[in-house]
Regions:
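Flanking scaffold residues of small Cys/His-coordinated metal-binding clusters
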Residues: 1-2, 16-19, 101
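Aromatic sugar-binding surface patches on proteins
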Residues: 6, 86-91
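Short cysteine-rich clusters marking metal-coordination/redox-active sites
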Residues: 7-10, 22-24, 106
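Cys/His-rich microdomains that often coordinate metals
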Residues: 14, 28-29, 110
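Cysteine-rich micro-motifs
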Residues: 18-29
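Long, charge-rich boundary regions
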Residues: 35-86
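Exposed aromatic-hydrophobic patches
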Residues: 54-57, 89-97
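Edge beta-strands of extracellular beta-sandwich domains
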Residues: 108-116
Length: 116
């Protein structure tokens, strides 16, 4: 399972295969913790088009409150990450036949996951 870190100062996202000591902006960061089940605002919508699963969200993307990334970890161990900035549309595409875990992170509420 991938381990994720997020720097609250500059917005950098770090990943590792195992827990690690991660430093950024003069601070040591702990691994992100799971926020539990996403409420309606933190859920991802999915539609299938031309053999692709397209994940989107109606989550706010303001400077203060936004999804910083969506990541997919394939069962083979490969990770694909899409980073988002405030005011950027949340959109993440996967081949329909890919299976594994999808992770997404809200800078205020934490990390979410689901099997896909």
């Amino acid at each position: 399972m991938a381990v994720f870190y997020f720097c609250k100062e500059c917005g950098n996202v770090f990943t590792s295969v195992n827990k690690a000591t991660v430093n950024c902006c003069g601070e040591t960061w702990n691994p992100l913790e799971f926020a539990g089940e996403p409420n309606e605002k933190h859920q991802l919508d999915v539609k299938v088009e031309n053999g692709k699963r397209i994940y989107t969200s109606h989550h706010p993307q303001t400077d203060e409150h936004y999804f910083a990334f969506i990541a997919f970890e394939c069962k083979c161990g490969t990770t694909k990450i899409r980073y988002f900035k405030p005011n950027e549309e949340v959109r993440f595409c996967l081949d329909e036949d890919k299976h594994g875990k999808l992770y997404w992170f809200c800078n205020l509420h934490g990390l979410y996951e689901m099997e896909v």
